């Protein structure tokens, strides 16, 4: 690592220290409540995993550069400078033991957005070259190929062909003027192609027009995860360009938490303009179809099941009631987890953690919190609405020898679609 890289990292951290961050540092009471809200701390007992401590280099930089006391301490040699070795050491704290889930921010008694501070810390780490190799590779593939997993258009077309054969329905691509532009995540394309089958059947029944885009089918945003606003903006910009080119009314984010955060909440700020279209998560769209009588189901799931709330979708995205409204249609034996909804515990693999191989050990330890939640319910099935959560849940349950299937909510609903004719589309 060159000195220039360290300088870039420090310069980037300085740029992130705005008025809100300064206020957060000034108002922190060191109460420790954020530690009790973080599953990496609760499941390991490691004090350095306390959320606010993960931004300690940035706090010290703020103190040294922007406070009178800090400048005096620095001049007297009482406050050590930030070094390359320190930032290398901090990489695991910032990237491996934080999923940006937002639970710490929820419990802060003075309202500090600790999650936002850690995101800003990642901006400096990324700019200085201190990001983990796994996320660097994912980000490079996202920019160069269009997918963090390296999924190219031919792979998607192969899945489309299978879905069309299984459903007997045509899947539209690059159709101008459709109501919905549907985005997918690489995980859904490669690991859970049944999601594509499900939305194809659901939109057909509802009589809705939709399309995929060959130039922007990927929803995952590695820029958000690694902490690079430039990369995040480029990836969002591709989706915006596709939506504008195809003149769609709504862009639908898939069952992926950070994809929703990127395009729905951070997107306009990243590209510096208001969208000329709506952005919704697939569950928001399905709940609207339910309310309009366009999502018709039959039969029920007799199994006792629960719902794992994806952090970015529920806690940070506000999509709380929609999945429960949808479950009420088909799941009479649905039970809530303790600490559900906006206070649910993270799966332990979001925010780019799953991309870092050296995070596997601590990630598996963090899963113990979810394990305890599930054991207390004695349920038969777990339903969720995030492909990354789904993979982590499947891995964690397998490691802990817990035989509980994991299902996506969209697919479950599609399995219960009432077989009738689609609503006739309005003609102009």
Located regions from the model:
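Short cysteine clusters
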Residues: 28-34, 38, 98-104, 108, ...
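Active-site glycine-rich loop that binds ribose-phosphate moieties when present
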Residues: 233-239, 285-293
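Iron-sulfur (Fe-S) cluster-binding segments and ferredoxin-like electron-carrier domains
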Residues: 36-65, 106-125, 318, 352-366, ...
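A short, charged/proline- and glycine-enriched loop
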Residues: 175-180, 299-305
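Long, charged N-terminal interaction/targeting segments
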Residues: 8-51
